Curated annotation (Swiss-Prot):
It catalyses: a ubiquinone + NADH + 5 H(+)(in) = a ubiquinol + NAD(+) + 4 H(+)(out). The keyword Hydrolase does not apply. HAMAP family: NDH1_NuoI. This is Probable NADH dehydrogenase [ubiquinone] iron-sulfur protein 8, mitochondrial. It comes from Caenorhabditis elegans. Complex I is composed of 45 different subunits This is a component of the iron-sulfur (IP) fragment of the enzyme. It is found in: Mitochondrion. Belongs to the complex I 23 kDa subunit family.
Amino acid sequence: MAMKSVAVLTKGMFGRIPAQLAVSSVPSNTIQKRSNYKFVGMPNETDGTLAGDLNYGLHNVFFTELFRGFGVMLGHVFMEPATINYPFEKGPLSSRFRGEHALRRYPSGEERCIACKLCEAICPAQAITIEAETRPDGSRRTTRYDIDMTKCIYCGLCQEACPVDAIVEGPNFEYSTETHEELLYNKEKLLLNGDRWEPELASNLQAEYLYR
């Protein structure tokens, strides 16, 4: 009964019972003074005083929240938009952006990958599979380089581990597919990505060389 009487005080000017009745039903040591509370901004309920009741009633009668929100809306009409019209407009990407994978070549056209398999070993998702063979000149090159893009978590560890900057994550993030098989990248697909994005890849690596 004591809790119910105190709660009635918060219902506003139209639902309150006389204060003396509520106080009489509650022990004096359980009553907290209204001065202990501070209403900030737009009040959602009355604070129990006559001024609070009047303020609460005016806000409900004249819909001040509605007009205040309308004013905020009008202010944003003349502000610069915070969004872009994607996909017709695209925002800038960081040089550290990690997108679709690619295998790079040297300017001579020779593949950079030396089949050290460091990327395969460090991949936490075990998404990379590499097979290699030794050439007559003693160098090693990959015969198979597969990445299961459905497993990849885009951590960038493969790129960090590569000693010759062969495997990188490029700027492309628009490569959604309709089938699972299209996300199983082989060596030819990765080299094609590298040829396509080489200018951007080289520029990004150069921009970040001090931090690698």
